[in-house]
UniProtKB/Swiss-Prot annotation:
Keywords carried by this UniProt record: Plasmid
InterPro entries: CobQ/CobB/MinD/ParA_Nub-bd_dom (IPR002586), P-loop_NTPase (IPR027417)
Name the UniProt record assigns to this protein: Protein MobD
Alphabetized Pfam families for the sequence: CbiA (PF01656)
Source species, domain of life: Bacteria
Organism, as annotated: Acidithiobacillus ferrooxidans
Gene that encodes the chain: mobD
Amino acid sequence: MAKSIYLIGGSKGGVGKSLVTMATVDYLQERGESVLLIESDTSNPDVWKAYKESTETELINLDEADGWIQLVNLCDSKPDSVVVINAAARNNKGVSAYGETLNSTLAELKRKLVTLWVINRQRDSLELLKEYMDAIPNADVHVVRNGHFGEEKKFELYNGSKLRTAVEERGGQSVTFPDMADRVSDDIYSKRMSISVALKELPIGNRAELTRWRNEAKKVLEGVIHE
């Protein structure tokens, strides 16, 4: 088998996809994996800006058929790289229209597609997840409750939903991602830093918080990332 594809989705802006993507890239690189990062948020490519110096990175528009073709060809040309896709906020239309391009080639690529679907506590990120699962039925899907929006029990809409049952019956997990102090996340975004660079360059208190968050994120990712 070639290495897996990890798609970090959510289809809404502001649910925390970028930070989950950064944590995923950081976790894989710490384990010695070669990573190919695909940034599909071409209007606000914050993960690309933070990682383009240290990681092989491509900007691809997945709202168009050409982007999906380019994505599949890249996945085929780099079988030894784990592919991490940061999906754009508006991406469900592109997935619904063209996702079959990737879905139908997974067997030939010899890759698993694993989706980390980041949610807040609102209904629309759940509705968008159902659309995504219908569009790419071959994907393994794990739901990531972003702890920035509250502790696990506050995600009542998802926790009690039929969608959660459907995700878990398909073998998916429901996990809760740690919150990062705003001061540190603001630094990472405004200074366009990767996590590893931030751990060297931020002030000592900020680095202590980032280390705490990184260790908590690692515990979550260990349960859903298997290379």
